Amino acid sequence: MYGLEMLEKIKLEYDKWACLTPKNSLYDRTLVWLFLSLLMIGFIMVTSASIPVSTRLNNDPFHFAIRDSIYLACSLLAFAFVVKIPMRNWEKYNVPLFLLSLLFLASVLIFGRSVNGSIRWIQLGPINFQPAELSKLAIICYFSSFYVRKYDEMRNRSASVIRPMVILFLFSSLLLLQPDLGSVVVLFVLTFTMLFIMGAKVMQFLLLIVTASVSFILLVLTSEYRLKRVTSFLDPFADAYGDGFQLSNAQMAFGQGQLWGQGLGNSVQKLEYLPEAHTDFVMAVVAEEFGFIGIIFMVVLLLCLSFRAIKISRDALKLEARFRGFFAFGVAIWVFLQGSVNLGVASGALPTKGLTFPLVSYGGSSLVIMSVAIAILLRIDYENRLTRVGHAQIKEP
């Protein structure tokens, strides 16, 4: 009986949702379909790309696929829970989230688990949690609240950018000790673009960009590990069996895909030639199995998701809901930047960074946190629509 009641409730909710047109719907259907499409594609590609390595490591071709399905279920549960949380709660508790993220980043240096020479994960029972993913969400939440409180000051006083820079330096220092330069790049771009939309002065913005660029160059030149990554990126085939092994095989995957690809499951490079085929380099497998058309399709999905987030941000700012607007803009930049960098790395256009493709690459932390970010976007859009309805009712005679 309980099961029948649950099914009946689900049917009623679906009927209510289905009878609404996109114009009067309380949720952005396009955003939901984009989210679900990327999750579905991600599960299919992780399953395809992970079969060889899963068979070798665990004698089970679907070991990583099963784990990914668990992460997928957790992501959907997190999505369903977070979409119910009012945005005022995120604004109210932005500091505790910020401090929690900082604590996790510090803890990973003490209790962290080393994988491929980097200490980026904390063992939490059967799962590995990557605090760097939480830090991106925490930075967006904290800066959105900070910019709301300091909006006028940010536009008139040069000293107002000092606190964001100090916070960015603190997070970046902890991330570089792991080391995780990719996440540092994401945080830098997030901070600068949010400063830009806040109306920071042009000279401030240019000074920050120059400072960041010089810092990045120094970080590369003073680290043999990072320098090797850059030099191997410039010519991966010069040391195809050494530092350039991963990039050279990724580029071969792109080349073999040609226009239409080899077909789902027919990738050669995933047969233990391409390391991390189901994580950071899953887009190389997409390119080999679905070709140039497949990559274009993924880019279109990424752009649609990013532009949808920007539209939600613009709508919120028009309604004078600055926290919601800044938050949505931060998520838009995060999604677009991380997807672009991942694709650039996989295609050989950028040095390897260790960043996942949003909602597609294998990785529980990335999948759950990104799903939470999309749920917040949906919540922002929902509150925007409620605000517009309220304004319309007030204007009625």
UniProtKB/Swiss-Prot annotation:
Pfam family, one: FTSW_RODA_SPOVE
Periplasmic side: 52-61, 116-126, 223-280, 347-356
Key words, A-Z: Cell cycle, Cell division, Cell inner membrane, Cell membrane, Cell shape, Cell wall biogenesis/degradation, Glycosyltransferase, Membrane, Peptidoglycan synthesis, Transferase, Transmembrane, Transmembrane helix
GO annotation, biological process: cell wall organization; FtsZ-dependent cytokinesis; peptidoglycan biosynthetic process; regulation of cell shape
Documented EC number(s): 2.4.99.28
Pathway participation: Cell wall biogenesis; peptidoglycan biosynthesis
InterPro entries found in the cross-reference section: Cell_cycle_FtsW-rel_CS (IPR018365), FtsW (IPR013437), FtsW/RodA (IPR001182)
Membrane topology: Multi-pass membrane protein
Keyword Membrane: yes
Catalytic class of the enzyme: transferase
Origin superkingdom: Bacteria
A cellular component annotation (GO) from this entry: plasma membrane
Record's catalysed reaction(s): [GlcNAc-(1->4)-Mur2Ac(oyl-L-Ala-gamma-D-Glu-L-Lys-D-Ala-D-Ala)](n)-di-trans,octa-cis-undecaprenyl diphosphate + beta-D-GlcNAc-(1->4)-Mur2Ac(oyl-L-Ala-gamma-D-Glu-L-Lys-D-Ala-D-Ala)-di-trans,octa-cis-undecaprenyl diphosphate = [GlcNAc-(1->4)-Mur2Ac(oyl-L-Ala-gamma-D-Glu-L-Lys-D-Ala-D-Ala)](n+1)-di-trans,octa-cis-undecaprenyl diphosphate + di-trans,octa-cis-undecaprenyl diphosphate + H(+)
Cross-referenced HAMAP family: PGT_FtsW_proteobact (MF_00913)
Function in brief: Peptidoglycan polymerase that is essential for cell division.
Name assigned to this protein: Probable peptidoglycan glycosyltransferase FtsW
Species this protein is from: Haemophilus ducreyi (strain 35000HP / ATCC 700724)
